[in-house]
Every structure is written in C-alpha cells, then in structure tokens.
From Swiss-Prot:
Coiled coil: none annotated. Belongs to the RimP family. Disulfide bonds: none annotated. One of its GO terms (biological process) is translation. This is Ribosome maturation factor RimP. Required for maturation of 30S ribosomal subunits. It comes from Shewanella denitrificans (strain OS217 / ATCC BAA-1090 / DSM 15013). Pfam families: DUF150_C, RimP_N. GO terms for cellular component: cytosol. Keywords: Cytoplasm, Ribosome biogenesis. The keyword Protein biosynthesis does not apply.
C-alpha cells in the first residue's frame, strides 16, 4: 500500500512543475485529529514567498478536488532551506561528501539517530560515514533525513 506521502507526490508533481518549480518532497505529520502537510518546492532561481503562495493555492485546489486526506490538516509550502530534507536516492546522491543526519525506523549500529558524511548511494542503499565507520542504510529505513548546514 502506498504511503500518503507517495500518493501526494504522485498527485502534486505535475501541478507544481506546471508552475515552474520542482517538487522537492512532501512530509505528512499526523498528530491526532489534525495533520500537517509540508510541501517543499525548489527552483534554480531560488524560491520566494510569492512562489510559495502561488504553489499553496494550486496545491490546495488539487487537494480539495482529490480529497486524499481524511482528517483536518494545515498546508505548509516552503523551500527546502539550508538544512534541506532529503527524500530520494537522487537527492542523497547529489549531496555525497556533505554532513547529514538521519532518523531511522529500525536501528543501525544500535541507534535510530545518526549523523555522518554521505559517502555513497547505490540504488536504494545509502552509505553514511559515522565517526570513521561506514554504515549501510536502506533508504526505506530512513524516516527523515536532512543536510546539516555549515556556517
């Protein structure tokens, strides 16, 4: 069965791309009777507040028609930001050599929260170097992944 995130990605990719943006990813946070749908958009020129507002209107219209979410929800549209979340193998691949943190569904090396350097991505397998040791992580075991911003 497809996750709500994957159904939303399938539903919203074309409308977001029609506006000239890339659908970077979607987070669905279910909190009791109220949920949050976070839609991340990106573009080579960057994302401005007007872009988020325009995308929010378009996404809201699609969600109103398709009605994939049965609970009350808040829609948030933003850029991925400097600590951008990572959703796909291609996104992890693009950030090889960068520091990242991942929250896992099942522990790896005794931990569900890891910080390290993205070493390699092969298919749906991520290699994360944590304290000098390469850890192999299946992408479907990652609940949440983010780049660690360097300042």
């Amino acid at each position: 069965m497809a996750t709500i995130e994957s159904r939303l990605v399938e539903m919203l990719t074309v409308p977001v791309e029609a506006l000239g943006f890339e659908l970077w990813g979607i987070e669905f946070v279910h909190a009791g009777r109220h949920s949050i749908v976070r839609v991340f958009i990106d573009s080579e020129k960057g994302i401005f507040i007007e872009d988020c507002a325009e995308t929010s209107r378009q996404v809201s219209a699609v969600l109103d028609v398709e009605d994939p979410i049965t609970t009350e929800y808040t829609l948030e549209v933003s850029s991925p930001g400097v600590d951008r979340p990572l959703f796909t193998a291609a996104q992890y691949q693009a950030y090889i050599g960068e520091d990242a943190k991942v929250q896992l569904t099942m522990p790896v090396a005794g931990s569900r929260n890891l910080k390290g350097v993205i070493s390699k991505v092969e298919g749906q397998i991520l290699t994360l170097n944590v304290d000098g040791k390469d850890l192999i992580i299946a992408l479907d075991n990652i609940r949440k992944g983010n780049i660690i911003a360097k300042f």
